[in-house]
């Protein structure tokens, strides 16, 4: 398992905690998703990628789908608020929503959504675009 984060402080913390917890076959990597998605070591190498709600879904798709193998899955946890359309990003990045479920976390009143996207084909080398572009000009 690879944990990817653009913030070095978080990665350093995770790398300190992983051995303390006795976790095996897990590592934290300091890298932006846009760069990781282009790196041969990570591109289309994972059966599954997951992300928390750090960006709108169309941007998350561009960040995460490059890591997922063909026929693999991307799982996003989002808030329950209505969101802008991400159909264009799904089509461009070869994804199809297989499951969307709304739930409430225990001891919380906040609803969350889990969105599971299956990747149906290999990704064009156009994606992910350079750092910052997905946010400035979303699909």
Residue ranges and their predicted role:
Residues 1-53, 61:
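Conserved SAM/SAH cofactor-binding pocket of Class I
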Residues 6, 79, 119:
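Cofactor-binding loop segments of dinucleotide-utilizing enzymes, especially the Rossmann-like FAD-
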Residues 10-12, 82-86:
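Short alpha-helix immediately C-terminal to the canonical SAM-binding loop
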Residues 25-27, 73, 96-99:
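Conserved beta-strand segments of alpha/beta enzyme cores
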Residues 34, 56, 79-83, 105:
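Short "lid" loop at the C-terminus of a central beta-strand within the Rossmann-like core
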Residues 46-66, 75-76, 80:
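A short SAM/SAH-binding and catalytic strip from SAM-dependent methyltransferases
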